[in-house]
Amino acid sequence: MSSPDGGYASDDQFHGNCSVPIMMGQYEWTDPLTMFQDAKTKKEAGSANSRGKAEARIRRPMNAFMVWAKDERKRLAQQNPDLHNAELSKMLGKSWKSLTLASKRPFVEEAERLRVQHIQDYPDYKYRPRRKKQVKRMKREEEGFLPSADIPGPQVMGCNAMVGQNYKMQYSGQNSQQSQITPAGYFEDHNPVGYYYRGYNVPEYYMSQNSSVTCGPPAQGEYQALSYNFNSSYIPYQQNASAPAMGKQMAVKENIIQESPEHGIMGCQVSPQMYNGQMYVPECAKTHPVAQTEQHSSLHQSQQMVTQNYLPSQQDGHLESDIDKTEFDQYLMYEPKSDTELIYTIDQDSGAYSTNLLPSLISEANSVCYYDYCGV
């Protein structure tokens, strides 16, 4: 049979006595009201301790002004309830200064009595300042309340940083705009363009008239000044080459011009080897006269063969009288001038050798590159 209460009483009793302690016994259950009461008692205990500390602190004896202002402050506060305590203190100070010595005497005597009484009550009393202003100032500096001089503010940094930020924000939000005005001072902190290329050597082509005969290996910049690579098989004569060799080369040149008087700018193409042998001469190659003599003879043989193959077969003899041979010196870049003739020119007055090669080299390089590009 069922119980009259439907079994709820027995269930409540069972759950209340057995179920909760068994299942939830590992947790600590606290009532919120109990927590509030504990906090209140702790607060009261703390306030009592603070009052005890305040009462334990020995106050200094009052001076004459404090004795007079004790009752006067109350009277002014009743008359002027809206005034702030600071304003009341100012008014009390002015009133105290306006008093005569006779009116101040009773307050001075009362202050002296209080001082004597204080000495008798606390013979070991030593004054201790209530506030340590220096300590508080140091704490504020440590916590960062006071601005430090090492950290520049916006007014110290200037407008460059602010303008730079605005400039970046404009470009991040407006990528479609193609033209933007560069703000003033944006490139002041950047290095110039030449700063990033300081470590690279710029190729320079320079030949001095007083350069020595023997020198070290040629620099890398000298090779970069030419359009073709240097062919080491063509090496010119040394400065003290024999005069008959020079005369022989002059004769070869005149014979070639007489055989083909109409050979002009459009007449032939010069091989890069011939061009390199005439144009670029490293000074360190001037120290091998024996090898130079053998290579020089083979050089001019090959030059004669190349020029004869490229010259036209038909020759007009009636044009020989109309052509000035000196005119070809400024147009014909392929004629096999001797290396000694290109580099060393004899001064008629002094009889000394001079090396003025740079202007001729520049003109030859420009013309040959133009003719090779045109394909003639």
From Swiss-Prot:
GO terms for biological process: digestive tract development; ectoderm development; gastrulation; mesendoderm development; mRNA transcription; Wnt signaling pathway. GO terms for cellular component: nucleus. It is found in: Nucleus. It holds the Pfam family HMG_box. Gene3D superfamilies: High mobility group box domain. The keyword Transcription regulation applies. A motif (9aaTAD) lies at residues 326-334. Keywords: Activator, Developmental protein, DNA-binding, Gastrulation, Nucleus, Transcription, Transcription regulation, Wnt signaling pathway. Residues 259-376 form the Sox C-terminal domain. Residues 327-331 are annotated as: Required for transcriptional activity and interaction with ctnnb1. Expressed throughout all the deep and superficial endoderm during gastrulation. Expression then declines rapidly after gastrulation, however a small patch of endoderm cells behind the cement gland maintains expression even into tailbud stages. The keyword Nucleus applies. GO terms for molecular function: DNA binding; DNA-binding transcription factor activity. Residues 58-126 bind DNA. Transcription activator. Doesn't appear to bind to the consensus 5'-AACAAT-3' DNA binding site, but binds 5'-ATTGTT-3'. All of the sox17 proteins are required for embryonic endoderm development and gastrulation movements, and show some redundancy in function. In addition, the sox17 proteins have distinct but overlapping roles in later gut development. Acts downstream of vegt-signaling in endoderm differentiation to induce a range of endodermal genes both directly (including endodermin and dhh/chh) and indirectly. Interacts (via C-terminus) with ctnnb1/beta-catenin (via Armadillo repeats); this interaction is required for inhibition of wnt-signaling. The 9aaTAD motif is a transactivation domain present in a large number of yeast and animal transcription factors. This is Transcription factor Sox-17-beta.1. It comes from Xenopus tropicalis (Western clawed frog). The lineage of its organism: Eukaryota, Metazoa, Chordata, Craniata, Vertebrata.
